[in-house]
């Protein structure tokens, strides 16, 4: 019996992962998979390389497959007719015949998310929505339930009103602050309301009054109105809040004497809006016909069988899972992993789409198809805005490397989230190596409901198998390495000091020291490579320009003519900018396959890229935060392999580019500081290094660029199982031996006592 079977994973998926040599689940998989399969939001933090992708991909894949086989509860078939309030047909609530009233998917603000009769907005601006139908006669009533804290205003509005109800003469509202509003006149009325309160809204066309209730308490007349003004629609405006409507499809929390649920009324639509709504329905159906794209493709009998039901009924599959990755490489990795995991899932075959910049998405020409969609933030945002992705049936919303996504693309993530169907069916999953920042926690609180935290590492955890070392880039101490007369091999620097450093002299000026540090770091890089005889390493630099210059420097040092193990300094570059997707992928594969020894990159590669057994990592430039340091060094020390992380730390501050110009550095030569209108800053590596020293205590390499003698036996890149390092555990094992025996005896005694307890009780009686 597989250990994954204990977690509830399908046999077909287990068969696929066993072929990948996944025999035992990692700790993060053991914790997260059952939680996700069981439903609910999950926030998981675990060390880099711990199997986080499998932790969310396996359960997502399983539930998607079960849903397609109609073994799950959520709907996946595109509707072909108007549904009721809860997704069921008919009038509901004992009236209205085939008439139904819903929240209008069209007449809403862009940041208002809708799931059936639940609406939510996490924007700091007011976001409004109206119902699809209204009334013009009778006495009717509806309720709304406040589902979390926030600001909201509820009431009635004409179709021509602003969505910010209560601010014009065509709408009437009652807000959570205990005020009624009409034409932007806010007057005390009733009582304030908040989370879990039930607000009733009633309208009486006979007496021409509008009023409100709170938890059954009637506050009486709030407004008078002209009953001939038109059709009155239920309406709502929110700010960072969530509410649920009940138009009468289920029993009201508090009945109001003399009033009927609004869905029992003669429901009406303004004539000018009916065409728009009908077109919307037609557009949705046309888009959904493409489904997973199988209607257009002939892949043999298996595919024909898989799509028989969909083709016959013309009811295409809808996307169930959306996974956002911060980089192309991570998206591609997750895509490949899910394809591997789903190898034996047939009837139907899971359709997976990859949406990244610079690549054509798998699927139709205008419609992105797939049961699972994986993509990068910018690309997904564009596709959602174009209407190329149907998010109406999303079951899983996954943020992988969530902290980076939130730091760099919060607005995009929020935009996409607000397009999802919120409610009980949506599971939000956060995965990363670090989830402890205030910004991440705040966003989690906004978009998750009672999430389960899985934290297997604590704040800023780093695997024990990584040795941390550093070299101080002191241009005075290592003067012989960078002075022109001593070493003609020089790196081309970034040009920051092209006009203010003509001679170095005795390095009295900060600019002179800064330029000297730039020249020195390249020489220190060579020394470290040669000292440890590095055959494979990732080198992190701060900017694309730095990466390109390091790459050229290594070529000049002898890495340009040969490749792989034959080239001592053979290298390739991985960063953003003009390095297009195909080239980036090729460069990464060259490094993985051993065609080059060194991968030079910016932080674009710091998240999630999996290169097994990588022995070395070099920080040519320190990252801007300790958390980014964690992600960088996480490239080594994986799969029980011993790793070494070396940082080249500037002895003084270094002046570097920090482009605020429109073209982001293209053709820019403005070396003034940013506070003076320029595009440069002083980068304080000594200060950045303080956090690393306090938390880790790295070892300084000696004058020969070596570790202390007692650490020289470490086999970097080698397995802990194959080195003498395992011998260090023998004394500890012997020490624990007696305690384990005692624990075993105690366990045996307790079990015997438990089993004999009934006999002893009988004797006492």
UniProtKB/Swiss-Prot annotation:
Ranges of compositional bias, category Gly residues: 87-99
The entry's keywords: ATP-binding, Exonuclease, Helicase, Hydrolase, Nuclease, Nucleotide-binding, RNA-binding
Residues in Helicase C-terminal domain copies: 512-715
* Enzyme Commission code(s) on record: 3.6.4.13
Cited InterPro entries: B30.2/SPRY, B30.2/SPRY_sf, ConA-like_dom_sf, DEAD/DEAH_box_helicase_dom, Helicase_ATP-bd, Helicase_C-like, P-loop_NTPase, RNA_helicase_DEAD_Q_motif
GO function term, MF aspect, one = nuclease activity
Q: Which Gene Ontology terms of cellular component type are present?
A: nucleus
Disulfide bridge partners, by residue number: none
Q: Return one Gene Ontology term, BP aspect.
A: double-strand break repair
**Keyword ATP-binding attributed:** yes
PANTHER family reported for this sequence: RNA HELICASE (PTHR24031)
What is the protein name stated in its UniProt record?
Probable ATP-dependent RNA helicase ddx1
**Which organism's genome codes for this protein?**
Dictyostelium discoideum (Social amoeba)
């Amino acid at each position: 019996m597989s250990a994954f079977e204990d977690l509830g994973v399908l046999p077909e998926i287990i068969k696929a992962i066993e072929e990948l040599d996944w025999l035992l689940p990692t700790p993060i998989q053991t914790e997260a998979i059952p939680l996700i399969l069981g439903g609910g939001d999950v926030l998981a933090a675990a060390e880099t390389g711990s199997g986080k992708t499998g932790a969310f991909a396996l359960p997502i894949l399983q539930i998607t497959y079960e849903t397609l086989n109609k073994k799950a509860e959520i709907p996946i078939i595109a509707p072909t007719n108007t549904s009721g309030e809860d997704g069921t047909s008919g009038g509901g609530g004992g009236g209205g015949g085939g008439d139904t009233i819903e929240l209008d998917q069209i007449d809403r603000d862009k940041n208002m998310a809708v799931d059936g009769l639940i609406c939510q907005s996490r924007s700091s601006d007011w976001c409004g929505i109206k119902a699809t139908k209204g009334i013009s006669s009778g006495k009717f009533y509806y309720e709304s339930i406040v589902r979390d804290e926030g600001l909201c205003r509820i009431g009635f509005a004409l179709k021509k009103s602003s969505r910010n109800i209560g601010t014009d003469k065509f709408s009437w509202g009652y807000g959570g602050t205990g005020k009624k509003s009409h034409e932007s006149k806010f007057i005390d009325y009733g009582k304030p309301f908040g989370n879990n309160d039930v607000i009733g809204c009633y309208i009486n066309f006979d007496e021409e009054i509008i009023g409100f209730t709170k938890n059954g308490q009637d506050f009486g007349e709030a407004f008078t109105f002209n009953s001939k003004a038109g059709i009155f629609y239920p309406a709502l405006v929110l700010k960072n809040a969530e509410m649920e409507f009940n138009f009468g499809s289920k029993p009201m929390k508090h009945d109001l004497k003399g009033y009927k649920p609004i869905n029992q009324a003669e429901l009406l639509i303004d004539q000018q809006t009916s065409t728009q709504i009908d077109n919307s329905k037609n557009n949705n159906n046309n888009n959904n016909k493409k489904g997973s794209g199988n209607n257009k493709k002939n892949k043999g009998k298996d595919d024909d069988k898989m799509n028989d039901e969909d083709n016959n009924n013309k009811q295409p599959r809808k996307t169930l899972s959306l996974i956002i990755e911060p980089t192309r490489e991570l998206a591609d990795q997750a895509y490949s992993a899910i394809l591997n995991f789903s190898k034996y899932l047939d009837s139907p075959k899971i359709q997976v789409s990859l949406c990244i910049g610079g690549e054509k998405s798998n699927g139709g020409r205008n419609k992105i198809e797939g049961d699972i969609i994986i993509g990068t933030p910018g690309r997904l945002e564009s596709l959602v805005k174009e209407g190329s992705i149907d998010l109406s049936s999303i079951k899983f919303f996954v943020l992988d490397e969530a902290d980076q996504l939130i730091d760099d693309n919060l607005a995009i993530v929020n935009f996409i989230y607000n397009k999802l169907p919120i409610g009980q069916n949506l599971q939000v999953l956060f995965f990363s190596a670090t989830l402890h920042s205030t910004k991440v926690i705040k966003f989690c609180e906004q978009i998750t409901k009672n999430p389960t935290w899985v934290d297997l590492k604590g704040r800023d955890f780093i695997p024990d198998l990584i040795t941390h070392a550093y070299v101080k880039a002191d241009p005075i101490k290592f003067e012989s390495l960078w002075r022109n007369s001593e070493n003609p091999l020089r790196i081309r620097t970034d040009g920051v000091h092209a006009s203010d450093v003509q001679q170095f002299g005795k390095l009295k000026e900060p600019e002179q020291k800064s330029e000297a540090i730039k020249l020195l770091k390249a020489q220190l890089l060579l020394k470290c490579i040669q000292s440890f005889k590095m055959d494979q390493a990732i080198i992190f630099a701060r900017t694309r320009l730095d990466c390109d210059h390091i790459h050229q420097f290594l070529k000049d040092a002898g890495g340009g003519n040969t490749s792989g193990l034959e080239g001592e300094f053979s290298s390739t570059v991985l960063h953003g900018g003009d390095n297009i997707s195909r080239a980036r992928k090729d460069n990464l594969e060259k490094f993985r396959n051993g065609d080059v020894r060194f991968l030079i990159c910016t932080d674009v590669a710091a998240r999630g890229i999996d290169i097994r057994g990588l022995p070395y990592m070099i920080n040519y430039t320190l990252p801007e935060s300790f958390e980014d340091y964690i992600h960088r060094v996480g490239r080594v020390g994986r799969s029980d392999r011993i790793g070494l992380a070396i940082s080249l730390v500037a002895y003084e501050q270094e002046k570097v580019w920090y482009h605020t110009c429109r073209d982001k550095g293209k053709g820019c030569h403005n070396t003034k500081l940013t506070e003076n209108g320029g595009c440069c800053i002083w980068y304080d590596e000594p200060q950045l290094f303080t956090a690393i020293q306090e938390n880790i205590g790295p070892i300084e390499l000696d004058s020969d660029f070596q570790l202390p003698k007692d650490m020289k036996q470490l086999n970097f890149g080698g397995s802990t199982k194959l080195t003498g390092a395992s011998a260090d555990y023998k004394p500890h094992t012997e020490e624990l031996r007696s305690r384990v025996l005692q624990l075993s005896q105690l366990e045996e005694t307790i079990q015997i006592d438990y089993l004999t307890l009934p006999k002893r009780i009988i004797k006492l009686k």
